[in-house]
Design a protein with these regions (language model features):
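Structural/interface elements that position substrates and couple domains in central-metabolism enzymes
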Residues: 1-206
Length: 206
């Protein structure tokens, strides 16, 4: 492989991969928290992020895109592993507890917002854009969309995702063939996975 090779003991190698994910989680969690503060006070995170990238201690490739918590399986698995290691060896992993708590809070942002707009009123139809836990994947483990669907069992849901198989979708959800089809006839519409095609939909088409 044409990449740096860093000799290290087995224990260090195991913890190295976990450490990379921990730093990623810290960036994700900090971004999500600050984006929510922006929403509360009228600031715009999109204006702030470019300034952070100019700081060499943060860098141009930093993960600074707000989202709905920590999705997928790998990051959560490593967080739980660190919790177990800390518990077994008497070290403090309180920051990991905070990351997991923040992730759950952010995951439910869409649920809180939709409830504030009456999503559970009788007869409401909810359109969902995206079911995967992130764009460019078919996987739904720890997906905010799936958590949202589970939290709204009495709500009629029309969902579109370009990659997730129909078999992965709860039977109560109606799958449709396009983003516009999911929006058509919906009283409320939530973008749960930031697939690029959603950004290109013209608001006048909705």
């Amino acid at each position: 492989f044409d990449c740096p090779i860093l000799p290290m003991r087995y224990e260090s190698a195991e913890l190295c991969k976990i450490s990379i994910n921990m730093f990623l989680v810290s960036s994700v969690s900090t971004t999500n928290m600050l984006a929510e503060v922006c929403e509360a006070i009228g600031a715009d995170w999109r204006e702030i992020a470019p300034a952070l990238r100019l700081d060499r201690r943060i860098g141009p490739h930093a993960y600074l895109t707000p989202g709905l918590g920590i999705g997928g399986g790998n990051l959560t698995r490593d967080l739980v592993s660190v919790q177990a290691l800390a518990s077994a060896h008497g070290t403090d992993a309180g920051i990991v507890d905070a990351w997991l708590s923040n992730s759950e809070h952010r995951r439910d942002w869409a649920l809180r917002t939709l409830r504030a707009h009456g999503v559970e009123r009788p007869g409401i139809v909810l359109g969902l854009w995206g079911l995967a836990y992130k764009e460019h994947t078919q996987f739904t483990k720890n997906s905010p969309a799936m958590a949202l669907i589970a939290a709204l069992p009495g709500v009629a849901v029309r969902a579109y995702d370009p990659a997730v198989a129909d078999a992965e979708t709860p039977g109560s959800v109606t799958r449709v063939a396009s983003a516009l089809a999911a929006a058509r006839g919906a009283d409320l519409l939530a973008t749960m996975t930031p697939w690029p095609e959603f950004a290109s939909v013209n608001a006048e088409e909705l």
